[in-house]
Amino acid sequence: NHYKKDIAFRSGLAITRQINTSFNFARNKVWGLDGNQVRTETQTRDFFPKGIMGNKGLPMAGWSIRFTGVEKWPLVKKIARSASIEHGFNGKETRAWQNRSLQTSKYTSSFSPLLGISMSSKKGTTISSRYALVTTVDNRFGGINSTRVRTDNTWTASTNYSHRGGFNI
């Protein structure tokens, strides 16, 4: 027999007409007995990891924030018809037990994007750039304990141009 319990909360808030936020928190628990009568349990929840092993953090909702109206800023208004800045965070903690003994724990911290910019120029060009930072801490227990940390830095950029109208031959 296996059992599952899920809970999730989502919300958003328009702080001003130009600043919009969203928040989400989820928790999942699965437990039961396998064919050999070994009790297994896995828990996953939104989490802000801290410390070398990630476990010094605290449960925390993920968030996103978007600033629109950036095209009105002095340096930007000369070139942009519209512009926005965005930022987001999502963190996870996943822990697994066997017969009530912790076997693994994994912590992920994802700033995606840490900073993102989107802009449409007055000449028909759209530009988008995003920088993301993702750190994963993977802990193994029982026998030989180990901790593996991986950090990925990603920068993406794209541009598009469109022209409307006809042409003469």
What are these regions (language model features)?
Residues N1-I169:
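Exposed, low-structure sequence patches enriched in small/polar residues
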